[in-house]
Structure formats: structure tokens, C-alpha cells
Curated annotation (Swiss-Prot):
Region (Disordered): 15-209, 222-251, 632-663, 851-950
InterPro entries: HAT (IPR003107), Rna14-like (IPR045243), Suf (IPR008847), TPR-like_helical_dom_sf (IPR011990)
Protein's UniProt name: mRNA 3'-end-processing protein rna14
SMART domains: HAT
Localisation per UniProt entry: Nucleus; Cytoplasm
HAT repeat spans: 280-312, 314-345, 356-391, 405-438, 475-508, 520-552
Gene expressing this chain: rna14
Taxonomic path: Eukaryota, Fungi, Dikarya, Ascomycota, Pezizomycotina
Its biological purpose: Component of the cleavage factor IA (CFIA) complex, which is involved in the endonucleolytic cleavage during polyadenylation-dependent pre-mRNA 3'-end formation.
Gene3D superfamilies hit by this protein: 1.25.40.1040
Major site of localization recorded for this protein: nucleus
Compositional bias segments (type: Polar residues): 42-55, 82-115, 151-170, 190-206, 879-894, 931-949
Record-annotated disulphide pairs: none
Amino acid sequence: MAEDDAEKAFFQAQAMNADSVDYKAVEDQGASSDSDDYDPSKTLQDQYSASILDSKQSEIAPSSASPSDPNPPTQSIPPETDPSQPADSAYPSQTPSRADSQASVSAPASGTSVPLKTRTIGGFVVEDEDEDDAGDADYEPPAVLGVEDMNTISMNVPQQPISGNANEDTPTPDVSMDGAVQASADAKNFPNSSYTPASAAASKSDTPALLSQDMYNSRTLQSENMQDSAAATPVPDSPSTSKGRLPHDRVGILEDRIQEDPRGDIPAWLELINEHRNRNRIDSAREVYERFLTAFPFSAEQWVAYATMESELNELYRLEQIFNRTLLTIPDVQLWTVYLDYVRRRNPLTTDTTGQSRRIISSAYDLALQYVGVDKDSGSIWTDYVQFIRSGPGNVGGSGWQDQQKMDLLRKAYQKAICVPTQAVNNLWKEYDQFEMGLNKLTGRKFLQEQSPAYMTARSSYTELQNITRDLNRTTLPRLPPVLGSDGDIEFGQQVDIWKRWIKWEKGDPLVLKEEDQAAFKARVIYVYKQALMALRFLPEIWFEAAEFCFLNDMENEGNEFLKNGIEANPESCLLAFKRADRLEITSESEQDPIKRGAKVREPYDKLLNALYDLIAKARTRESQDVARLEETFAKINPDTQPSKTDDDDDDQSDSKARESMKNAQIEALRNAHAIQIGILSKTVSFAWIALMRAMRRIQGKGKPGEMPGSRQVFADARKRGRITSDVYIASALIEYHCYKDPAATKIFERGAKLFPEDENFALEYLKHLIDINDVINARAVFEMTVRKLASNPENVHKTKPIFAFLHEYESRYGDLVQVINLENRMRELFPEDPTLEQFAHRYSSPAFDPTVVRPIISPSQTRPKTAFPTEQPVSRHGTPSSRYPDASVTNSPKRPLEDFDDEMNRPRKFIRADSPLKTTQRRQLDPPKRTQQVISNQTGSQFRSQGSPAPLPRDIVYLLSIIPSASAYNAGRFSPEKLVDLIRRIDMPTSISQIPLPPSVRGLGFPEMSICLWGRLPSTTWPKTVHPCGKPTFIALSSITRVKCKRFTGWRSPYIRKPSLPPYGTYSPSLAFLISV
């Protein structure tokens, strides 16, 4: 059925005489019975609102051919062509008569310009439909598929192509439904596709069909002679209805994806190329390759695929053109490998009798190693180069001149290869070792010894580089940086970090080239920058760093080239545009004419502003598309029907209102989300204008009317173009005041106050300006007006806080106290959560000092240092002595251990009997932990049982504690470890080994033998800080002693000292220090 429709469409196209047909005749033909059999709208799957009824209705009230020309033309207008291409240009796959077959009926283009209405806002003359207010008005696109559109659909039957490639297949018949105007120079053989090239789309931008695709146009075309059309009602164009693609129209769908997102949807590009190649459409594949490589000129992978395709097709001339365009600008190992294969293919060595082919191949290898020989993956090229030299005439080790020449070439190649950190450096070194030792062992050792440091450096550097780039994805298909929090942001950040570490590693000069070969060092750094920019093409900071490195190393041309390419890749980048403008401003100081110099400096700013304004337009278009898609979704879910009066009830009305409110809420949320993005772009545009304004002020001053633009002309251009924030007015006013003391600054602030009445930042800067010119009365008036307007809206109350804070600071310093108190009262009413102390202290404080929080030192007791250990409370010496023997109820007998019951109610009933006397042997063999429990229970009372000590004490210490009396029984002075530690802390310790007196006795190799004597009742945490007073204490750090003979103790009699971990004989521990007796 589809073939029958296409055949009918073909006959209809043949019946239409393109030279003499007019729109009236077309309408009559559309109303005839023959044309009723084929209706293009039937193939659109109800995506367009136009119907056959509309086309029949147009017979009664025909519409004009053009909005600006009510009289229809008497003959068809030929399709517009791309001005960038010659008129007779056509791809080899197209026949000369194809353009005639496609020129069925074309919609006329409107060539007249429509003036825009102007109005005055805040004293400035602005356009009526400026972009600042364009979003508030509803856009009404022209009719979709009206009478003209229904009858001007081009119906093309592709003919058999005449191509240089005999293997192209014959395309299937097609009926195009996209537009009425198609450029004959750009027509392609797309089966089942309605693709229109970008050049053709640009050439028909004045037609109503294309205007219907842009819902938020920045300028609404108006014409006084425009007549009302009764053909069809304008219907908003949605993304789904703007194309009308069939499901099997794979090429058209991919083209739509590319047109919507050319820089972000790289998979669509690659799928489209594969689709053409699978269909054996080589010319179409070439065209897509050229478009892709125009957008991504440094994508080496696709250049390699493009060159491989031409090589497989034996298109050697096209292949050479690719090499001429890429080899010197794209340093890629794989691309150069393809080139070397091509050179060896065109210059066979088997039939080379003159040696010309060998010389050509050798020069090709030299050129390749010059450009990509420093790459860490270039080991294959170095290996092939060495093998190529080995295969040359002559014998290694011979005495002839050819033999000597071959030996010299091999030695030179090996010595270059082993200095580069590549994956083949180890194998090349082994081969070089065998080569030198095979010639002459004596001279070979000399050469190897000379080249060994370079080889060791290259080998270790390659290992380091592999560790850095282990997780690196060395792709040349650039990716737009994902927004933080979006899909892929972590992976992209990891790749960026790896590239930056590689660049930092190269700048660190691991191969030690900076001192010996400065040019080689710079070349390696520039090479890695170029490699990084292939993958990070859309990251402006890498372009900036590369250009800055070139400028710092006297490489002006390379730096400018980096900036130029970076701006081409990122035209919306303020960083690169500002850097480029600064370089132009610095390098053009010798230019005497300020107008020419200003034009040169302004060029990067203009490119930046154009790109930003285009982004704003695309954002508005995307917003309209999203809103239309949302409305279409709700329309499909809830179709608009007209119910009868009998079916109306309260439930239906409530459901309808609920659905409408839900739709409006989602649309409002969608618009708010887009408004945030557009607001950021508007802010960026404003600061770009500010940067341009300041640059022009430095070059041309404030300007003169009719003579020199200057900063004032930039301010006028910014206001005329729109989409600026209050920052532009603030910057212009402050330039006028600080640079020229011109009263125009106040006028600019006054006009800005009318345009931005709710901008708190502008109001704050306005107040500061009035205070600077000592106009306090107007400053207070502006303050009251701004605060009253903002406070009237509860949502804007928070915006008044910085304004209150500024005036409060001014009044507290230079105003009246009554004014200050009144301001504080108003601030308490508006901001009750702010503490009163903070408001009061703000009067007397500065950013560097606050006197209200200062606490002066009155007494030395306020600065008493903290003790290292808390002071223990003294124990009463006259307490009641406890019983010598423990309570029988808790005594743990060694014959029958004490049972532990948590529940006192379930304890078994026992009888108390007298304790049997323990023998001495049994007492000594008593379990130490249990004995400890008995002693502690004896001291603390029989009503408590021990919960267990952190660590068990030695058995001898437990026995000692069991036989000595309690400490409360002694009335003599007690040992205070805290005071002793404090005394040691105040002792001047030696800081070097020379201050330590050596002991008189020296044994062995001169190392002192020390005996460690420990005593005292110290907590274990203070070890080893005290000694028995049997000699002069001396402090020796073990870090200054290489050999220490330590005495191991077998018995300890101190109840509070645990045996430390002493180092064995002949070792030392730098972290320990001992107090010893000499």
C-alpha cells in the first residue's frame, strides 16, 4: 500500500508544472477527485491538527502565500540554496535532473523586513518585544499544514544515482513530509527519511513552516499589511508533531537527535554513520563524517575510521586529503600508524631498485617519531622503525660503507628509542645490548655505560606513568562535563583528575630534560596537553592552563592557538574569551588608533555574547517544547470532550478542576526550573557586558558621540540587546563615578531603580553610592522606599536584611542614637530570630575586632595551667580499722569455690560454719585473682563483692599486698607521685648528646653498660619516669644509643609497677626513654 501511495504521489508531482503553476491552481488540484485518494496527513498518525476538512474549507477562504505578501506568486520560486556551496554543486550520488524532480511546489520566502515597535522603560528606549519580557507573552505560531502546507509537500522519487562508487545500492521510493522547501544542492538519497540538511533548513528560515518550530522566538514578526487567514487555526507545535517520523525512519530519527543536541549526543552521530555504511551509502556517510569532524575536529578515532573507510574503498586521493588535514594538527599514534601503512603500501620495497621508496618510508618514520614519538604508547612505531632499518641493505658488522651506514642508523635509532618511556623500552634495550656486544665488546660496554642512565630513567618513568594512567580512558570522543549530581559526574571527575596528574607529572620533569634539553621538555608537556584536550575538549580550564603554560615559556603562537581552538570548542566560555581579550589588549598596545584596537579587542567578547544569547534562545525553546509535551501528555490522558448538560454534575467538575490544577502545577514547576537556568545565563551575559565595558573604558575611555564608542556605547548596546541584570547598571554607574566623577552615575542608578525595584543588591549599591557622594537625605529616602516595598511582600522580607545591616552600621558610626534604636526596633520586628546582643554589639565592632566579647585578665589565678593528673582526695588516717578476717559469707575457700548467683531469691540455702585454718602451702597456692577478691572485699566491707580487675596482678605482688598492713595504719609522710612528676617536668633536660655526661666505666666497643633500678609506688602509666634515690639521676634517650644491654628482672616487689616490655640485648627503641642511675 505504501508503494501505491508513493506511486500516486509521483504521478501527482509529474502533473504539477513547476514553471507555471500558481497557488490557486494548486488549491483546485487539491480539491479534485484525483488528489483525494492521497492525503499526506493520513501518514502522520494524527500528529497534526490539520485535517481534510480544513483543506476543503480553504477553498472558500484561501490563505495568502506569505504573511508579508497577500498576492500569491504566479510562478513557483526555485528552492533556495546554501550560499556556502556553488549553485551547481551536487554529490556524486545525485543526477543532474534530481533537483528538477524535487522542485514540485515551494513555499515562498518572505523577503521584507518588519520593523519592531519600541517603548520607553525607565528613561531608556527599548524594543517592544525585548527578550526581558518576551517570555511573558504567549506565542502563537502560524498554522501547521494549512492549505499551502497540504499542497506544497514535496513528493520525491529518487532516481538511480550516478556515483563514483559502483557498490551503492538503489534507494527505495520515498515521500518526504518535512518541509516545502528543499535545497537541491543538499538533497540526499535517504530512503524512508524526511531528513532536511542543516544548510537547507537555514535557507528556508523565513517560511511559516519553519517559524512554527520555534515557539519562543525572540522577535515576533509583525506587518501592517498582514491579512487574517481563515484557513486554519494556529496550533502550537510540539516535539512529537514537528517531525512526523515514521517508526522505520531510522535516518530521520537520528538526524532529529543530532539537530536537537549536536554536541552532546555523540552516539547519534556514530549510529547515523553506521546506518549509512550498512546501507552502502558511502556519499551520505562521507557527508556525516564531514559534519561530525567539523563539530569535533580533534576526534582522532573518527579520523582513523574515516581514513580506513577511504582506504578500503581504494579512494587514495581522498585518503591523502585526510592525511593533509590531520597529521600535523592531531598527534595520535593510531592515525600516524594508518599513515605509515599507507606510505609503505604506496612505496613497495620489493620493486624498489633505485632506493627512492626506502628514502620516502624512512622520512615518513622520522616525521611520525617527531610528532608522536614521545607518546607512551608509541613503542610499536619505534619497534617497526628499528626493524625497517634492519631490513635495509648491508650487513651489521660488515666493513663496507653500506654496512657502516646501517650500523650508524641502527645505533642512532636505538639510542633515541631507549630514552623514551614506552612499553617497548625493555625489549629495545635488550636488542641494543645484543647489537653493541655483537659488534665489539670493548666499545659496546662503553656505549652501554653511556646510555644506561637514560634507559634506567625511562624505564622507571614508564612504571610511574603506568601507575598514574592505570584507570585512564584514552578516548578522543569528547564528552560534555556532567553537572554535579548528574549521571556520570563521578566518573568524569576521575578521568579529569587522572589527566591533571599526568600533566603535573610531565611538568615535574621526571626525565630530567629541563636543564639539558629545554625544547624537549616543552614538547612533552605540550604533547600531553594536546592528548588531554582530545578527551576534555569541553573543559575550558584545560585550554586555559595549556595556553598559560605556553605564554610563560615564550611560546606565543602556541598559546594563541590553544586559545583559538578552545574558544571554537567552547564559545560560551567566559574564561577563554576573557583570556583571549586580555592577550589582544596587551599585544596591541603599539596600535595608535584606539578604534582599531578596540575593534580587535572586542572580537572575543562579541563571540561570547552571541553564544550566550543563542543558549538563552535554545533554553526558551526547550522550555516551550517541554511545556508542549506536558500539555500533550495531559491531553492524551484526559481528552477534551464536550459532555452534554445532562452528564454534568459536581463530581465531573471537581475532577476536571483537579486535573487542571495538577497540570498547571507541573507546568509552573517546569517553568521555574527553566527560569533558574535562564537566570544563570542572564547573569553570565551581564558580566560579559561588564568585562567588555571595562576593556573599552581602558582603551577608548567613556567615548564621544559620533567619534569613539567607549564604555558608554557598550552600556547602550547592552541595554538594547536585553537579557541583562542590575549588575550592568551598577558597573556602569560606578565607572562613571570613580573614573570621571560624572553626575551621570546618579542618573544611571535612578533609572536602574525603576527597572529593578525589588533587587536588594542594586538597592544596597545605590545606598553606598549616595553615602559616598554625601547625599544622606536621598540615601534615607531610598532606604525607606526600598524597605517598604520589599517588606510588603512576606516572601521578600529576607532581602531587606543586608540593607538594614548597612544602614545600621552607618547610623551607629555617623548618625543619631535615636535613629540607631529605631532601626534596631524595626529589625527586631522583621527578624525576631536574631539575638539582641548581636545587634547591639554590631554598633561598636569591626570585622577585625569586637570589644564587647573581650574578657580582660584580672588575676593570675585565671591563667593557672592545668595539671596532667587530677589530684586525689586524701584518705582519712583515723578511720575505723576493718576486720582482719573477711566475712564468712563471702569467703572463697580453695576447697569449694564461691558460687555466683545473680538472683538472690533463687540462692540455695546454706549453713554457716567456722572456717578451717589454711595451711601455709595452701595459702601460697591460693589463686591470685581470688585472693585479690578476698582482700578487696575485706577492705571495702562484706556487703560488696569485687567486679573483677582490668588485668590480673602477679602472684608475688598479691601475696605482698595480703600480708602488709593498710596504708591508713602509717602516720609518716606519704610518697606523692604527682609532685615528683611535676618536679621532673621542671628539670632542664639535655637537648643533645654532647650535654649528657658519659659514665666512667666503658666496656666492649665503648658503649656504656647501664643498670636500671626501679622503685616507688607509681601508677603504671607514669613508667618509666622515677628511680630509687641511690645515685644521681641522668636522662638518656635511647635514640642516641646504638647498643643497650638491658637487665631483665625476674622479681617485682612494687605494688603499683608492672613489668615493662624491655628491648632485647643489642637493640634499641627510639620511642622509649629511661631515667637511669650511673
